[in-house]
Amino acid sequence: MEVKELERDKNRVVLEYVFNREEVLEAEDKAARYLNQRVEIPGFRKGRVPKNILKMRLGEDFQEYTLDFLMDLIPDTLKDRNLIMSPVVTEREIKEDTARFVVEVHEEPEVKIGDVSKIEVEKVDEEKVLEKYVERRLEDLREKHALLEPKEGPAEVGDLVRISMEVYNEEGKNLTTREYEYVIKEGEDRPFVKDLIGKKKDDVVEIEREYEGKKYTYRLKVQEVYRRTLPEIGDELARTVNNEFETLEQLKEELKKEGKDIYDVEMKESMREQLLEKLPEVVEIEISERTLDLLVQETINRLKREGRYDQIVSSYESEEKLKEELKKRILDDIKRDRAIEVIAKERNVDVSDEELEKEAEELAPFWGISPERAKSLVKSRRDLREDLRWAILKRKVLDLLLEEVTVKVVEPRGEGDGDERKGDN
């Protein structure tokens, strides 16, 4: 086999493969053995048809099988090339005693990463977020520790109503009976709950609903109406929440720590997402238009196989507009992935087996399995292991880059005009 580079366009390389007579004959032998097990030629026993008879009877079909077996030899020659997609065979033929293939290979494109400090990510003002969090949690605790007093009068805003709900079908059969408690809120519009306003103990409300063409009757009986008295925000509330607290300030401090833990996790994730979204802005890439066009067509073919293409293309002015959008997204995705890979290599960022195990343990509850089972799965399944390794690597690289980006502190949503900037850091 001889391999020659015919053409290079950035990451796209066109290679010519030429197989000699011995290699072609060997591939013909493989094709003959393969076909002997699958075709029947009149006058010959199955599996006993001579190669020359198969060549004569099958003609071009035999040649195609021979070319297929030769094609199987090509991937091994590409192992040292990092390919972004499968090789594309543009020509293949057997001429006289040799076979010739022309193959397009699309390597991972080279990237150059610019000044990451030009990327701006937003960070919501920590003090204001925690202040709002503490206020909200204190209100939650007031609600949780409300004093309940049965009342004779009708249910009104702020009251808690305990009901039994019976559901009947069209034939009058009782399908279920359950008890519920609802707190009636200002501007109440929840189904059933709004129908309880003004009702007293022992009152009955019947409501008809239709689901999937069937009618159901809901019979709500008011078991009890309670007037709720919310405790004042003060030292007494703190002691009620936890007898280890003596003062409101101690409770607030604990709530602030609780909020800080949530804030740190959610804000770090938000900043990672912002950075990842903007990373392509500082990445220069050497990629062939042919590569992008093939990847776009590959995506369109997949959407068609999944039956989603018509719905998606209908949201664009034309197929060309869809292709433009897909091309941009694919290019940005390649920039992101290549940048992560290059930075990880340059800065010696790696993922250890211990980190993989820890990640598996943390994901186990979401997978609905035990931590030990999760770790075993990661060890036994290479695809899962590589997916996790990439997720961890990407997170570690982004965290490194977050130390270099420009961070803009902004007001929490709903605070001021929602866009006010506090400054840079």
From Swiss-Prot:
Protein name, as recorded: Trigger factor
Physiological role: Involved in protein export. Acts as a chaperone by maintaining the newly synthesized protein in an open conformation. Functions as a peptidyl-prolyl cis-trans isomerase.
Predominant location category: cytoplasm
GO biological process per UniProt: cell division; protein folding; protein transport; regulation of DNA-templated transcription elongation
InterPro entries attached to this UniProt entry: GreA/GreB_C_sf, Trig_fac, Trigger_fac_C, Trigger_fac_C_sf, Trigger_fac_ribosome-bd_bac, Trigger_fac_ribosome-bd_sf, Trigger_fact/SurA_dom_sf
EC number: 5.2.1.8
Organism this protein belongs to: Thermotoga neapolitana (strain ATCC 49049 / DSM 4359 / NBRC 107923 / NS-E)
GO molecular function, one term: DNA binding
HAMAP family: Trigger_factor_Tig
One Pfam family, short name: Trigger_N
Similarity comment: family membership: Belongs to the FKBP-type PPIase family. Tig subfamily.
Enzyme class name: isomerase
Chemical reaction(s) catalysed: [protein]-peptidylproline (omega=180) = [protein]-peptidylproline (omega=0)
Keyword Transferase: no
Subcellular location: Cytoplasm
Every PPIase FKBP-type domain range: 158-231
Keywords, sorted A to Z: Cell cycle, Cell division, Chaperone, Cytoplasm, Isomerase, Rotamase
UniProt remark on domains: Consists of 3 domains; the N-terminus binds the ribosome, the middle domain has PPIase activity, while the C-terminus has intrinsic chaperone activity on its own.
